[in-house]
């Protein structure tokens, strides 16, 4: 069957089978238009096919999504940026991607900690950042001082005694939080 591909002002016909996968069609488009797709440390370039306003997955076949004879698919070259750094939050067990430009690597650890605080909500004074080898990172040093490169995963560790309090806050456990905030000696020591 014949379908049409709209790409950067061109409108080209392609003869394909109904069971052809979207991934195979992307390869045909890449070869026909000589599109250089690449991947590096900062991101990757890829093709996206759209039909009726929806992005098509590589594994789908044309017949799966109702694409018939003389249908028109739109094709775009898109860039997917990779995070500059990742920060593993030891409290929540979540990985935080840090999507800043590369100049972040030349900045001080304190600048990164401010970004992390804005993302996770933890006060700067309750945690430290560690390198992949476990070395504590000090605010006055630059990220380059710790051989931090694009894609490095750092670890956020909280100081002793803060993990339980922060988890109580994150999970909405009011009695646990009140216990940690109490000024009354018996409640602080023996509360629930």
Swiss-Prot record:
SUPFAM superfamilies assigned to the protein according to its UniProt record, in alphabetical order: Ubiquitin-like (SSF54236)
Biological source species: Mus musculus (Mouse)
Signal peptide: none
InterPro entries: ANKUB1, Ubiquitin-like_domsf
Protein's UniProt name: Protein ANKUB1
Organismal lineage: Eukaryota, Metazoa, Chordata, Craniata, Vertebrata
Superkingdom to which the source organism belongs: Eukaryota
């Amino acid at each position: 069957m014949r379908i049409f591909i709209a790409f950067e002002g061109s409108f080209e016909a392609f003869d394909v089978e109904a069971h052809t996968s979207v991934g195979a069609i992307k390869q045909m488009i890449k070869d026909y238009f000589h599109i250089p797709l690449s991947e590096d440390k900062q991101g990757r370039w890829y093709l996206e096919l759209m039909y009726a306003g929806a992005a098509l997955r590589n594994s789908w076949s044309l017949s799966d999504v109702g694409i018939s004879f003389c249908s028109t698919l739109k094709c775009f070259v898109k860039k997917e940026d990779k995070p500059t750094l990742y920060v593993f939050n030891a409290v929540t067990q979540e990985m935080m991607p840090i999507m800043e430009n590369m100049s972040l690597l030349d900045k001080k650890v304190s600048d990164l900690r401010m970004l992390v605080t804005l993302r996770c909500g933890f006060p700067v004074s309750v945690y430290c950042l560690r390198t992949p080898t476990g070395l504590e990172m000090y605010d006055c040093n630059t990220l380059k001082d710790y051989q931090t490169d694009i894609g490095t995963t750092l670890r956020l560790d909280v100081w002793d005694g803060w993990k339980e309090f922060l988890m109580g806050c994150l999970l909405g456990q009011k009695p646990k939080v009140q216990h940690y905030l109490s000024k009354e000696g018996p409640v602080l020591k023996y509360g629930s």
